[in-house]
Regions:
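Beta-propeller fold detector
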Residues: 70-79, 136-140, 183-198, 250-265, ...
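Beta-rich, blade/repeat-based domains predominating
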Residues: 32-43, 85-101, 107, 144-161, ...
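Blade-loop segments of beta-propeller domains
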Residues: 67-113, 118, 123-124, 137-145
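Short loop/turn segments immediately following beta-strands, especially the blade-tip
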Residues: 131, 177-182, 189-191, 243-254, ...
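Conserved beta-strand positions in repeat-built beta-propeller and related beta-rich domains
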Residues: 48-55, 106-110, 164-168, 225, ...
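Loop/turn-rich, solvent-exposed surfaces of beta-rich toroidal or solenoidal domains
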Residues: 225-245, 259-301, 307, 313-314
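Beta-strand-rich domains and repeat architectures in extracellular enzymes and scaffolds
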Residues: 28-59
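Beta-propeller domains
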Residues: 48-80, 115-117, 129-131
């Protein structure tokens, strides 16, 4: 009798689980030849970046119109860099895109090689007006800001400042958008340095750098709290920390005092990227599980979807309709991390996922 009751209970549990449907993934765009790691969507156009170090060919920044036509953006000239060429008005290696109103902000690491040094005038933040398709301002990071080993990674904005993570030579870069002045903060602080006890695992395997050691990626994801008080950030493998923006932007605050004001935020797992909505929901990819999750303002973490197609979602984009755009560059499968042999499964896609339930 006990076995019958247990069996009935198990069947009921399974039946209950079967009614929980995952949201559907919709393919927005896909590529059979270039890896895309970041996406933005504006007025019917989709913008995609393809970092040079992955070894695939194509523009650093591509625009796809409503008819599916693809073109280098904002021009072919901006996508024409070659070794030895002046890098001031060309993209060397784009790592991130950020849409703010009608402006597209482009983060150029300036380093054509993973783990390499930025070339002269290569590391920069470029602002493009999407109404005119013109570059309206470029913020250059000289050798005192994008230092040897720097990999300027991602960007967020608040109160006239830009905040960028340095995933190579660990730190945070603060830029005054009016004057263009930039400075480094929290250099090599424990909150920006990848921890040795947190490996990056995908497909149940530790991702290894070209030297055979476990890959470590320093300060990478970041977000600004919806009230503009905090900057949230962390190494790619987590966890995340927070610091008040008023402290970050105070040049008179001694480095040791700023470091003392850093607080723990959340134990976010290894993530390729994140995006926060107007309610403070933090959407992030969970690399180890091919999943998208969301951290609610109260700290609860919910799962949106688990799907093997979402392999290394890198930089989610949330559009005005509440749809997540999810690029899946499969970074762990590129030749650089696999002894020179690419394991990328083509085509590489950007998926759409509704956050509305």
């Amino acid at each position: 009798m006990t076995r019958l009751l247990l069996g009935a209970a198990m069947l009921a549990l399974l039946a209950g689980c079967s009614t929980v449907k995952q949201p559907e993934l919709d393919v927005a765009v896909q590529s059979s030849g270039q890896i895309w790691n970041a996406v933005a969507h504006y007025s019917g156009r989709t913008f995609l970046s393809g970092p040079r170090w992955t070894g695939t060919q194509g523009p650093q920044l591509t625009a796809i119109d409503q008819n599916g036509q693809r073109a280098a953006y904002p021009s072919g000239a901006w996508n024409s860099w070659a070794p030895g060429r002046d890098a001031a008005n060309v993209f060397v290696n784009i790592n991130a895109l950020r849409l703010e109103g009608d402006k597209l902000w482009v983060v150029d690491t300036g380093s054509p090689e993973f783990g390499g040094n930025p070339v002269s005038q290569g590391a920069k933040l470029v602002c493009i007006d999407l109404r005119t398709n013109q570059v309206v301002r470029t913020y250059f990071f000289g050798p005192d800001i994008a230092i040897a080993g720097s990999y300027v990674d991602d960007v967020r904005f608040s109160a006239g400042k830009a905040f960028l993570t340095d995933a190579g030579n660990a730190g945070i870069i603060v830029v005054d958008l009016e004057t263009g002045a930039a400075r480094r903060v929290l250099d090599q602080h424990t909150s920006v340095v990848a921890r040795p006890d947190r490996d990056l695992i995908l497909s149940n395997q530790v991702v290894k750098a070209p030297d055979g050691q476990p890959l470590r990626v320093n300060a990478d994801p970041l977000e600004v709290s919806i009230d503009g008080v905090w900057l949230y950030y962390g190494a790619l493998q987590g966890p995340w920390f927070k610091v008040r923006i008023q402290d970050l932007t105070n040049p008179a605050l001694p480095p040791e005092q700023l470091a003392a004001r850093v607080e723990f935020f959340a134990d976010i797992p290894a993530t390729g990227g994140s995006v926060m909505d107007a309610q403070g929901n933090l959407y992030f990819s969970d690399l180890a599980h091919d999943a998208m999750r969301v951290r609610r303002p109260d700290g609860q973490i919910d799962t949106l979807i688990v799907d093997e197609r979402l392999h290394w979602v890198d930089a989610p984009f949330l559009d005005k309709d509440g749809t997540l755009w999810l690029p899946t560059p499969q970074m762990d499968r590129v030749a650089l991390f696999n002894k020179g042999k690419s394991l990328v499964q083509w085509p590489v896609a950007v998926y759409r996922l509704s956050t509305q339930r």
